[in-house]
Design a protein with these regions (language model features):
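Short, contiguous strand/loop micro-motifs
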Residues: 7, 31-32, 80-81
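Conserved beta-strand-loop-beta-strand hairpin that lines the nucleotide-binding pocket
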Residues: 1-4, 49-126
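STAS-typified acidic loop motif
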Residues: 3-15
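Short, motif-level signal for alpha-helix interfacial/capping segments enriched in acidic residues
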Residues: 8, 25-26, 51
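Conserved short strand/loop->alpha-helix "switch" segment adjacent to the catalytic nucleotide/phosphoryl-transfer site
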Residues: 14, 18-42
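Active-site rim helix/loop that mediates acceptor-substrate recognition in acyltransferases
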Residues: 41-45, 49
Length: 126
């Protein structure tokens, strides 16, 4: 599939961000969109590592009017916004992902879950 960054288990944040840059480079996305996508990639990958034992699959795709970031892990547990006080570091990743993404989808199966975040290309062109 053109424009895909499909990778297998064990990917770390730095590699996921590098792959994301490589996949999006031919599409000449705005710096703002690239920054948002890289933030979402970092949050989803680090959450999978921190809370679910690691990434089992990673993909990033440039679609016509959006960028899709897909991260799978082995946990069936759904992400949730932590009730962390603002004085305590961390706990804001899922909220951040949902703020930056136009929409998110979660599918749960026998092997864990896949979270897909869709970021609008047109919303960041202004």
């Amino acid at each position: 599939m053109p424009g895909t960054g499909r990778h297998a288990a064990g990917i770390r944040g730095a590699d996921a961000r590098r792959i994301t840059r490589e996949v999006l480079a031919p599409h000449r996305v705005s710096e703002r969109l690239l920054g948002d996508v890289l933030t979402v990639v970092g949050e989803l990958v680090s959450n999978a590592i921190r809370h679910a034992g690691g990434v089992t699959a990673f993909d990033v795709r440039h679609l016509h009017d959006e960028v899709a970031v897909e991260v799978s892990d082995a946990s069936p547990l759904l992400p949730h916004a932590a009730g962390t006080p603002v004085t305590v570091p961390g706990g804001f990743g899922w909220l951040l992902v949902n703020t930056m993404a136009a929409r998110t989808e979660i599918s749960v199966g026998a092997d864990g879950k896949t979270i897909t975040a869709y970021l609008s290309v047109t919303a960041t062109m202004a």
